Design a protein with these regions (language model features):
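Active-site helical microenvironments for divalent-metal-assisted chemistry
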Residues: 1-179
Length: 179
């Protein structure tokens, strides 16, 4: 592992310190970005160090007080831009005022898929590695109904991201959906 990748690993672990993932047996949050990076490297055969670093940092802007400037100054403009590109945008309070939970989920899902469709090829590759990690965890952590809904969203994601982006990751996500 290069010094730069090691620094990104330490950055991610530190940024997510004290956070846990969802579920009854919630692992430390840092396990997720590490899995995303490993998915990129070993399932996706990605050896682009910037993308591996983005895999480690992809949730830092939305889940921690980390700033875009902090990421860019530590890891460069390409990493900073990709992490920003992967950061979800949430509906405004006005958009969800008086809206039922299921309808909010549909709104957020539609927003996410629209964002993914506009992402760069590199960001879409990281998104596939992220979704692979998330769908595996969701199988264990979500109720049957929520997991079924999540699988539907994942199938839509596979329709938005072309298989040619990264056949190894795309096929792995598809296999999880079919499982």
């Amino acid at each position: 592992m290069s010094a730069r990748l090691h620094a990104a690993l330490q950055f991610a672990v530190s940024a997510h310190a004290g956070q846990d993932r969802d579920g009854e047996v919630a692992p430390p949050y840092a396990c997720h970005p590490i899995e995303v990076m490993l998915n990129l490297r070993y399932t996706g055969d990605v050896d682009d160090e910037d993308l591996l670093i983005v895999g480690l940092l992809h949730d830092t802007l939305e889940e921690t007080p980390t700033t875009p400037v902090g990421i860019e100054s530590a890891f460069g403009p390409r990493v900073g831009a990709l992490v920003q590109e992967l950061t979800r945008h949430e509906p405004t309070a006005a958009e969800v005022a008086g809206v039922k939970k299921d309808e909010i989920w549909k709104l957020r899902s539609g927003m996410l898929l629209a964002e993914i469709e506009k992402m760069s090829a590199d960001a879409q590759v990281v998104k596939l590695a992220d979704r692979l990690s998330n769908v595996r965890e969701a199988r264990i952590a979500k109720s049957a109904a929520k997991f079924a809904r999540y699988l539907g969203q994942t199938q839509s994601l596979l329709e938005v991201i072309a298989r040619k982006r990264n056949p190894g990751l795309w096929d792995a996500v598809k296999a999880e959906v079919a499982r």
